[in-house]
C-alpha cells in the first residue's frame, strides 16, 4: 500500500470543521481524519464502491487499527476505483455516446421500492447510480452535501448570524426543488389559551418537560428561509433551551418559584423552575437507533457526529448496540463493551451504514428495545437513542399506532431519547408521540453548534433518568390572584384529578435537567367567594401566600408518586431568571402571532442585554445570548 496518507491539508472547509469537532471529543488524529473524511454512503455510486474496497482490504491487515489503515490507504484505493470508473465511462462513450446527450442532467421519479407503501410517502430521486452505469460528473451532482455547521473558528456574532442564515444547496434543498417546494412537515395543533379565573379554575396542572426540540426546529426553518409554522413553536421548549440559576437540592427535584412585576403592566409574572438532582453517571447500556432511509441523506453528517458524540461520553465497560432501519432494520453490532479498542470497531462498522430506501421505524424500535432488554443493567442507565426525521412511511406509522407501540415498550423500564434531524418532510408530531409516551425526551439538532449545546454539554441531562411521570401544579390564592395565564404547555395541560392520579403518565427528568414555566397574573381586588380548596377555605390563614407550587414524580423503577410543595409569599425583583424566560415567551408569542404578545422590541433588546450583561445567568448561557438576539431580530 502507498505511504501517501490523508492529512488535514486534504480536508475541505466542512471536513476541517468536523475534524476539529472530533478532536474536541477526544478522538485520535487518525480517528478524526477518518470520521471527518467519510460520509455515510448512498446505496449506489463510486463512494460506496470505495468503502466496500476499503473494508475488504482491511481484512488482510486486521492488526492495524482501522482509522490508521483508512488514513494511510484511502487515497490509493479511492484513486483505483475512480480510475476503473473512468475507464468504463470511456468505453461506454465509444459504444453508445454520452449519457448526457443534449438535454443535460434529468431527474425523474424513483421506482417504488418493493414492499414499501409509496402511496403514503412519495419519494423523488435520481435513477439508481453507480460507477458502472453513470458518468462521474452526474454522480457528483447527485451527491447530497452535509448540512452546514457552525465552527469554533468564527466569532460568536458571526456564528449567531450563520445559525439562522439560509444554507447552501444540500439534500433538503434538492428535495424542495424536486417536489416544487412541497411541504410535508407535520405538527400537533396548538390552541392558545387565555386568562383563567381563579374562582373558576383555582389550580393549573401540566406535565413537565425538559424537551428543547422546538427551538431546533425554529432555527432550522429560519435557516432555510421558511415561513414559521405557528404549531412548531412550543414556548415551554424555547425556555428550556436556555440555562437558569436554579439550585439543585438533596431531593430528586427542587422547586424554585418567584413573583415579580411585569414590565409596563399592572400584572405580575410567576416564574417556576424545577431542577433535577445532579447525579454521577451510572453504567450505561445504550442502543443507538439510526434512521438510514433515503429522506435522511442530507442529515447523514450530523447524524454521524451525534453518534460519535454519544460514544465519546461512554465509559470503559459500558455497553453499546447500533441498529439502523430503512426498508428493514439492520443490526450493525450489539452488546459491544466500550474500551480503547472498541472505538476502532465502531468506526469501521460505521462504514457499513448505507442511506437508502423507505422508513420502517416500528421494526427498528422493536429490535432496539429487544437489545436494550438483553443487556439491561440493574440500577444503570438503559436507553434507546433514536435519530430520525420522523418520516415513517411504512410499518406502524400513525400517531395512535406509535403511541400504542411505545407505551408497551415503556413497561420494560428502558427509557428513550429522540433526536430529530432535518426539514421538508419532518414529522414532529410522530417524534413528540414517541417521546411523550415512551418515558422519553426530545431535542432537534441540525448543526454542530446545536449538537454541542444540547448533547455534548447536557449529556447527563438527556441520558441519565432520575425520575419519571413528573407533573406540576400551581394552586392560586384568590385573595391575591384574580386570574392567570400559563404561557405555553397548551398540549401538556392536565386536570387536578389527573395530577393526583398515578396512572396518568408524564415525561421524565434527567440528572441536572430543568423545566421552566411562566404565568402572567392579574391581581385580585376586593373579596372573593369560597370554592373549597386550600386558599378558598383558609384565605385568612394563608393571606400572605400568592400560590403553592406542587410537583409529583416517581423514581425510575417505582409506580407510586412522591409529592413536594413550595409556597410563594413575596414579590421580588425582576430577576435574570425571570427576564430570560419572559423574553423567550415574548419571542415565541411573536413567532406564533399571539394576541397576548405586548413586549416592545426595544424593551426586549434591553432585557436581553441586561440578562447577559453579568451574573450567573450570563455565565451559564455564554454564546446563547447571540442566538437570543438573532431570534429577537428575525421576527421583526
Question: Which stretches of residues belong to each language-model region?
Answer:
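Amphipathic alpha-helical segments in structured regions that serve as interaction surfaces
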Residues: 7-43, 47-58, 66-69, 73
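Acidic/polar low-complexity segments with low predicted structural confidence
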Residues: 143, 184-268
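Long, acidic serine/threonine- and proline-rich intrinsically disordered regions
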Residues: 104-108, 122, 126, 135-146, ...
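Exposed acidic/Ser/Thr-rich ligand/metal-binding surfaces
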Residues: 104, 134, 152, 253-469, ...
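Short helix C-cap/helix-to-loop transition motifs enriched in small/turn-promoting residues
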Residues: 45, 62, 228-231, 247-252, ...
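Polar, glycine-rich mid-to-C-terminal structural blocks
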Residues: 415, 441-446, 452-457, 463-510
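Hydrophobic residues positioned within well-ordered beta-strands of beta-sheet architectures
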Residues: 206, 255, 270, 286, ...
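Low-complexity, Pro/Ser/Thr
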Residues: 1-2, 68, 72, 78, ...
Amino acid at each position: 500500500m502507498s505511504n501517501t496518507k490523508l492529512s488535514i491539508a486534504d480536508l475541505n472547509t466542512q471536513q476541517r470543521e468536523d475534524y476539529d469537532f472530533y478532536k474536541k471529543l477526544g478522538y485520535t488524529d487518525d480517528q478524526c481524519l477518518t470520521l471527518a473524511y467519510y460520509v455515510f454512503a448512498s446505496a449506489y455510486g463510486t463512494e460506496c464502491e470505495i468503502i466496500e474496497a476499503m473494508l475488504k482490504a482491511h481484512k488482510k491487515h486486521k492488526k492495524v487499527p482501522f482509522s490508521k489503515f483508512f488514513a494511510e490507504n484511502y487515497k490509493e484505493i479511492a484513486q483505483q476505483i475512480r480510475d476503473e470508473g473512468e475507464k468504463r465511462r470511456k468505453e461506454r462513450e465509444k459504444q453508445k455516446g454520452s449519457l448526457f446527450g443534449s438535454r443535460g442532467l434529468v431527474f425523474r421519479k424513483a421506482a417504488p421500492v418493493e414492499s414499501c407503501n409509496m402511496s403514503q410517502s412519495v419519494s423523488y430521486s435520481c435513477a439508481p447510480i453507480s460507477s458502472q452505469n453513470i458518468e462521474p460528473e452526474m454522480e457528483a451532482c447527485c451527491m447530497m452535501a452535509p448540512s452546514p455547521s457552525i465552527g469554533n473558528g468564527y466569532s460568536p456574532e458571526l456564528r449567531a448570524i450563520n445559525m439562522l442564515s439560509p444554507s447552501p444547496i444540500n439534500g433538503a434543498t434538492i428535495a424542495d426543488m424536486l417536489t416544487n417546494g412541497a411541504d410535508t412537515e407535520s405538527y400537533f395543533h396548538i390552541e392558545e389559551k387565555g386568562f383563567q379565573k381563579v374562582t373558576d379554575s383555582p389550580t393549573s396542572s401540566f406535565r413537565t418537560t425538559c424537551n428543547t426540540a422546538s427551538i431546533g426546529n425554529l432555527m432550522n426553518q429560519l435557516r432555510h428561509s421558511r415561513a414559521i409554522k405557528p404549531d412548531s413553536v412550543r414556548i415551554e421548549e424555547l425556555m428550556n433551551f436556555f440555562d437558569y440559576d436554579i439550585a439543585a437540592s438533596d431531593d430528586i427535584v427542587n422547586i424554585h418559584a418567584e413573583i415579580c412585576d411585569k414590565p409596563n403592566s399592572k400584572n405580575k409574572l410567576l416564574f417556576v423552575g424545577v431542577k433535577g438532582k445532579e447525579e454521577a453517571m451510572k453504567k450505561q447500556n445504550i442502543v443507538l437507533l439510526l434512521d438510514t432511509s433515503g429522506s435522511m441523506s442530507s442529515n447523514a453528517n450530523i447524524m454521524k457526529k451525534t453518534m460519535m458524540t454519544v460514544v465519546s461520553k461512554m465509559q470503559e465497560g459500558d455497553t453499546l448496540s447500533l441498529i439502523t432501519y430503512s426498508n428493514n432494520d439492520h443490526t450493525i453490532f450489539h452488546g459491544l463493551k466500550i474500551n480503547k479498542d472498541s472505538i476502532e470497531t465502531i468506526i469501521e462498522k460505521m462504514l457499513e451504514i448505507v442511506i437508502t430506501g423507505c422508513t420502517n421505524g416500528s421494526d427498528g424500535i422493536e429490535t432496539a428495545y429487544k437489545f436494550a432488554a438483553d443487556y439491561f443493567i440493574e440500577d444503570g442507565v438503559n436507553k434507546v437513542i433514536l435519530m430520525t426525521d420522523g418520516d415513517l412511511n411504512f410499518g406502524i406509522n400513525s400517531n395512535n399506532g406509535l403511541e400504542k407501540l411505545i407505551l408497551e415498550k415503556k413497561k420494560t423500564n428502558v427509557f428513550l431519547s429522540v433526536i430529530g434531524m432535518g426539514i421538508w418532510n419532518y414529522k414532529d408530531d410522530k417524534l413528540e408521540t414517541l417521546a411523550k409516551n415512551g418515558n422519553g425526551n426530545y431535542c432537534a439538532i441540525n448543526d454542530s453548534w446545536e449538537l454541542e449545546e444540547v448533547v455534548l454539554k447536557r449529556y447527563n441531562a438527556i441520558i441519565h433518568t432520575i425520575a419519571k411521570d413528573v407533573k406540576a401544579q400551581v394552586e392560586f390564592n384568590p385573595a391575591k390572584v384574580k386570574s392567570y395565564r400559563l404561557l405555553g404547555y397548551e398540549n401538556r395541560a392536565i386536570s387536578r384529578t389527573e395530577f393526583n392520579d398515578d396512572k396518568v403518565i408524564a415525561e421524565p427528568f434527567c440528572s441536572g435537567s430543568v423545566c421552566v414555566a411562566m404565568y402572567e397574573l392579574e391581581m385580585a381586588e376586593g373579596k372573593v367567594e369560597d370554592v373549597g380548596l386550600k386558599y378558598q377555605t383558609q384565605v385568612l390563614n394563608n393571606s400572605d401566600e400568592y400560590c403553592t407550587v406542587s410537583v409529583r414524580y416517581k423514581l425510575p423503577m417505582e409506580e407510586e408518586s412522591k409529592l413536594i410543595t413550595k409556597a410563594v409569599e413575596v414579590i421580588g425583583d425582576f430577576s435574570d431568571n425571570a427576564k430570560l424566560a419572559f423574553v423567550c415567551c415574548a419571542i415565541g408569542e411573536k413567532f406564533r402571532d399571539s394576541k397576548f404578545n405586548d413586549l416592545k422590541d426595544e424593551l426586549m433588546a434591553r432585557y436581553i442585554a441586561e440578562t447577559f450583561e453579568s451574573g450567573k445567568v450570563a455565565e451559564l448561557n455564554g454564546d446563547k445570548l447571540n442566538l437570543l438576539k438573532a431570534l429577537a431580530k428575525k421576527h421583526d
